[in-house]
């Protein structure tokens, strides 16, 4: 029976001595996952910029002058080419994001076709397109979409300080529609928005107390983009970030926890502690829109130091991969990539 987390218990969890918390998280992690495996995702912006929303952290909002060049929907051939390269680099999941408040009905045939074509490659698929209605969720599920990303971002109490163009209830409603359609949920949040510790606790409570916990939980460290209202936010204490990762693992033991945006600003040691605390998924080998992800060579070296290997359980391992389990680097057009997690 799934545990229901309340604020008192969550506060006790967060207040544990740091090493006790990490130790508990690592034990919980080993109950459900191989600690030496990591799930690799690649993400692509299929429509960039000119978003009508006012999310204060996001460079894609049309309300802020971030210098981001807007781009129309990509051709399907461009998307499939990127997906093929992603698979060759070791990714098992291909994520696609569009800077919309919600998809229009005229876009649905295009989106459904993309899902079907990427699925033919043997990859898991994920999309983040904004809010969905029931019909759209069912169409995407029927097309074969495995995951739908729709983050809660922060606590319900702090949410209105970050976004006013979409309510918290709308986000929860979309997650419910996604779940009812049969798709899996990818939903997490951002640390560093100016929230208090209790907001972090309440975010994790909201996610963990969903009827079925998200299969994928991206935890982002705010990337401060010039031109957004949050460009001068205070830096996140790495130990506090690691504490959030550990609490996420304990509260959602069966979920993949993705160390998402902000890795470029993390030391190898911080990332290693995040993996120790239960993170077991990353976005790899791609640029996160206007912010950069660690260079492929740097990630490669870190994984080798930590003896981390990609999780190939979604796709069969080719003979080439059997001979060399280390991640392979592909020559990807980085300008097209976008942080689907935020």
Curated annotation (Swiss-Prot):
InterPro entries: Aldolase_TIM, BATS_dom, Biotin_synth/BioAB, Biotin_synthase, Elp3/MiaA/NifB-like_rSAM, rSAM. Pathway: Cofactor biosynthesis; biotin biosynthesis; biotin from 7,8-diaminononanoate: step 2/2. [4Fe-4S] cluster binds at residues 51, 55, 58. It is an enzyme of class 2 (transferase). Residues 36-260 form the Radical SAM core domain. It catalyses: (4R,5S)-dethiobiotin + (sulfur carrier)-SH + 2 reduced [2Fe-2S]-[ferredoxin] + 2 S-adenosyl-L-methionine = (sulfur carrier)-H + biotin + 2 5'-deoxyadenosine + 2 L-methionine + 2 oxidized [2Fe-2S]-[ferredoxin]. GO terms for biological process: biotin biosynthetic process. Its EC number is 2.8.1.6. Keywords: 2Fe-2S, 4Fe-4S, Biotin biosynthesis, Iron, Iron-sulfur, Metal-binding, S-adenosyl-L-methionine, Transferase. Catalyzes the conversion of dethiobiotin (DTB) to biotin by the insertion of a sulfur atom into dethiobiotin via a radical-based mechanism. HAMAP family: BioB. This is Biotin synthase.
């Amino acid at each position: 029976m799934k545990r229901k987390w309340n604020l008192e218990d969550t506060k006790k969890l967060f207040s544990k001595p740091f090493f006790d918390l990490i130790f508990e998280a690592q034990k919980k992690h080993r109950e459900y996952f191989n600690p030496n495996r990591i799930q690799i995702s690649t993400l692509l912006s299929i429509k960039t910029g000119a978003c009508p929303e006012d999310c204060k952290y996001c460079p894609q909002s049309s309300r802020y002058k971030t210098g981001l060049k807007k781009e129309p929907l990509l051709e399907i051939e461009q998307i499939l080419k990127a997906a093929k390269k992603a698979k060759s680099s070791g990714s098992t999941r291909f994520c696609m994001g569009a800077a919309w408040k919600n998809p229009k009905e005229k876009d649905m045939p295009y989106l459904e076709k993309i899902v079907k074509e990427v699925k033919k490659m043997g990859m898991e698929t994920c999309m983040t397109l904004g809010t969905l209605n029931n019909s759209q969720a069912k169409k995407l599920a029927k097309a074969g979409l495995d995951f739908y990303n729709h983050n809660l971002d922060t606590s319900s109490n702090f949410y209105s300080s970050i976004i006013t163009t979409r309510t918290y209830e709308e986000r929860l409603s979309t997650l419910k529609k996604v779940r009812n359609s049969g798709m899996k949920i990818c939903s997490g949040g951002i640390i560093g928005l100016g929230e208090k510790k209790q907001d972090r606790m309440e975010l994790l409570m909201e996610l963990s107390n969903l009827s079925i916990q998200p299969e994928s939980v991206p935890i982002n460290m705010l990337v401060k983009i010039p031109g957004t209202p949050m460009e001068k936010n205070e830096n996140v204490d790495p130990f506090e970030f690691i504490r959030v990762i550990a609490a996420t693992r304990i509260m959602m033991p069966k979920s993949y926890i993705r160390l998402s945006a902000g890795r470029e600003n993390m030391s190898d040691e911080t990332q290693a502690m995040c993996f120790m605390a239960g993170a077991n998924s990353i976005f790899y080998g791609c640029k996160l829109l206007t912010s950069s992800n660690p260079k492929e060579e740097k990630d490669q070296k870190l994984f080798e130091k930590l003896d981390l290997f990609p999780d190939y359980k979604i796709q069969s391992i080719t003979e080439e991969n059997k001979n060399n389990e280390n991640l392979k680097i592909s020559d990807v057009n980085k300008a097209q990539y976008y942080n689907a997690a935020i």
